[in-house]
Amino acid sequence: MSQMRVTDFFSQSKRGTAAQNSKGRKVEAVLETRRAVTRSRAASVKAEEFLKAPCTPERASPTVSQCIGPSSKKRTRQDSDSEPLRTQQRQGKSARKKLKLPEGEHGGSVQQQLFSPCNKVALEHVTPSSLGKKIKDMVNVSLSPKFNELARNPTTPETKSPAKENLLELKSRLQRIQELAQKVNLPAASSEGKVTITDLKARLKRAQELDTKIRAKAEKTETQAIDLTEQPAQESEKAPAYQRFHNLAQDAAPGLTLPYKYKVLAEMFRSMDTIVGMLFNRSETITFSKVKQGVQDMMRKQFEQRNVGQIKTVYPNAYKYRQEKNIPTFKDGVKKTDYQLTIEPLVAEGDMLSGRPHLSASRLLERKQLFHRSLTSIVKQHHRVFLTSLNPPMLVPDDKLTRWHPRFNVDEVLDVTPAELPLPPQVERLTTAQEVLSKARGLITPKMEKALANLALKTAENAGETKNVSTEETKSTATTSTSTALKGVSQSLLERIRAKEAQKLQAIMTRRPQQEERLLMMSRLPELARILRNVFVAEKKPALTLEVTCSRVIASCRSSMSPGEMEKHLALLSEILPDWLSIHPVRKDTYYKLNQSMDLNLILERLAKKTKEEESL
């Protein structure tokens, strides 16, 4: 026997022998449908539209497909209808997923309803055209959204007399709205019907109160706007930071330092005195224009008559100022007949050279020192006013004052007010509009002058009253703020604290520079004592040389110090605590001996106590 091939099984269907028996009949049906396709195209289109449903129907039995009627016409139609069914069934065997139709009203799906046995029997006795029409209607009804909603929720309001319930709800809502409207309208009508004079008065009073509140609010906004506009102007008038905080940036030791503007004024006086001395020794007429050009070349700063007035305020006996004319200037802008400010230095009778006054270099140095002392005395006056304004007030003699109060801001001291310089004599010439107006002022009648004077007095009084009110308000706010901050604290305790603080500040202000340096060294001693003990413990020796001790302590100390400074600190430590650290000079070397049996905490307490005693002196 020959071996069977795989292709021999292609003609067999999955249904087994039933499909093999009907093989001949299938071939005949296919041939007949090919002949009838052209004649029954309309019927096949309708069947294809139905067969395009999501689910492929079950395969019909050979009896249904071969149901031949009495006439050949009906048979050809049935064959043409059944052929697309078979082709679609063959296509249904592919790997494409089936789309399940929604379930019907009685729980079964539309597919089951369409192809149930009872429907199959009914379809056998119907013509193809009516069959397609009925199946289409059935599918459309089953696939419509309304049908699905009814299938899912059979107890919707549409099934249970929805019209009655909706009418009842609407009626109840209308009734509630009418009741609420009556409740709202009743009080308004009653109040409108019973309007009395008291009600009108109350309303009028309320309107007046609202009017006053609105006006007060408008005034408040205006004042705030004015303050906001004035604040930038004040900030722009402030000096730059390098001038306001010049005192804090100085490298020198703290003392009676001058503000930045006072230092600039002192430098201006030195430059001016130098130029005046040169011109005076050459017997030249000293004018302000010559001095101005020379000072500006030396300082690279603007020099005006205002600065000359400040110099006159600080040192009034330095120069003699006059207005003179007929001085040759050799300038196009200044005429010989114009008045000019002349400056002449006041020299003592003993300063003579070759029979005439002479301004020597030593005299210039003395004048410079005298000007500096005058500036310092002006700052001391401001400092004295500041001390009296403290609570409690302090009084420190000027000769014992070595530094300013810590809260006294030196760079915010008021500038020196310029003194009046001699002005050129006025000649009766009406050359400007201002002169014409001043001349026409004499034409005003006495009544008009009196009225203008009264108006000026009234405006001045109003301005004074507003200033007094503002000062009183600021004082009251300051007292209330301090009282609220110190609420619950006894007055005697506050006075004692303030007195102690004032005493401490007074001691700081009158302290000598040597004492200040000693206190600074004593503040570093606790840290040095700790490091020194660790060094001796690590070395495991009772005594160490000076060089070794200083090098070890400098290496461990936070602040960098030279060996000479470290030697001074150790000498001070041995002076304060001789029983703990002792110095022993042996031949050419110096040894430090430390008593390691003493407690370090006791040593630190003794150092702190000694520091407090030194500060209180």
Swiss-Prot record:
GO molecular function: chromatin DNA binding; DNA binding; DNA polymerase binding
Feature: compositional bias, Polar residues: 1-22
Taxonomic lineage from the root: Eukaryota, Metazoa, Chordata, Craniata, Vertebrata
Region: Disordered, residue numbers: 1-27, 51-111, 462-483
Role, per record: DNA replication licensing factor, required for pre-replication complex assembly. Cooperates with cdc6 to promote the loading of the mini-chromosome maintenance complex onto chromatin to form the pre-replication complex necessary to initiate DNA replication.
Positions of short motif PIP-box K+4 motif: 1-25
Organism from which the protein derives: Xenopus laevis
UniProt keyword annotations, A-Z: Cell cycle, DNA replication, Nucleus, Proto-oncogene, Ubl conjugation
Family, as annotated: Belongs to the Cdt1 family.
Subcellular localization, as worded in the UniProt entry: Nucleus
Effect of T7A: Abolishes degradation by the proteasome due to the disrupted interaction with pcna
Broad class of where this protein is predominantly found: nucleus
Matching CDD domains: Cdt1_c, Cdt1_m
One annotated Gene Ontology cellular component of this protein: nucleus
Domain comment, as recorded: The PIP-box K+4 motif mediates both the interaction with pcna and the recruitment of the DCX(DTL) complex: while the PIP-box interacts with pcna, the presence of the K+4 submotif, recruits the DCX(DTL) complex, leading to its ubiquitination.
PTM comment text: Ubiquitinated by the DCX(DTL) complex, also named CRL4(CDT2) complex, in response to DNA damage, leading to its degradation. Ubiquitination by the DCX(DTL) complex is necessary to ensure proper cell cycle regulation and is pcna-dependent: interacts with pcna via its PIP-box, while the presence of the containing the 'K+4' motif in the PIP box, recruit the DCX(DTL) complex, leading to its degradation. The interaction with GMNN protects it against ubiquitination.
Subunit structure: Interacts with pcna.
SUPFAM superfamilies (alphabetical): Winged helix' DNA-binding domain
SMART domains found in the cross-reference section: CDT1
Keyword Ubl conjugation: yes
Any GO BP: DNA replication preinitiation complex assembly
UniProt name for this protein: DNA replication factor Cdt1
InterPro entries linked to this entry: Cdt1 (IPR045173), Cdt1_C (IPR032054), Cdt1_C_WH_dom_sf (IPR038090), CDT1_Gemini-bd-like (IPR014939), WH_DNA-bd_sf (IPR036390)
